[in-house]
Amino acid sequence: MAKTLSKPASGALAPWLGISLIVILFDQLSKIAILKTFAYGAQHALTSFFNLVLVYNRGAAFGFLSTASGWQRWAFTALGVGATLVICFLLKRHGHQRLFSVSLALILGGALGNVIDRLVYGHVIDFLDFHLGAWHFPAFNLADSAITVGAVLLIYDELRRVRGAR
């Protein structure tokens, strides 16, 4: 007899918060490992297009507002906390929608991973450095990756929903 996965009841936050917690755990452990292993700015080439490098981001994605006077730390922390509240509300309300909830759980875990950095260190720790020759994509971390994957899944879920409504 084949087992089927039951859908979490609407209002069941535990499975989705569990996913977020796993993201936070891997994100924070990876950052601790980089902090213990690398000096600031030190690079270690793993392939011809990928390095590990320890950098600090005081701004947002792509270093946006990283040179501001310091207010951005608290603004982005508040934004992350606000996003957490909205996402928890949405998860409580739509927990039965699997893909939607997984995408939100990934975004939540990533957002909280970066909020933790801002509160503990005053900046976000980035270390994944993809490059093509001398051109480097801005360094990022596992929390950023979870946010990106969650956003892509959210867009896919919405496109699927809209197409299904036709």
Swiss-Prot record:
Main localization (coarse): membrane
Record's function text: This protein specifically catalyzes the removal of signal peptides from prolipoproteins.
GO biological process: one example: proteolysis
Membrane-crossing residue ranges in chain numbering: 9-29, 45-65, 71-91, 100-120, 135-155
Membership in a protein family: Belongs to the peptidase A8 family.
Name this polypeptide is given: Lipoprotein signal peptidase
Cross-referenced InterPro entries: Peptidase_A8 (IPR001872)
UniProt pathway annotation: Protein modification; lipoprotein biosynthesis (signal peptide cleavage)
Lineage of source species: Bacteria, Pseudomonadati, Pseudomonadota, Betaproteobacteria, Burkholderiales
Topology in membrane: Multi-pass membrane protein
Residues at the catalytic site: D126, D144
GO cellular component, one term: plasma membrane
Root EC class: hydrolase
Entry's EC annotation: 3.4.23.36
Organism: Burkholderia cenocepacia (strain HI2424)
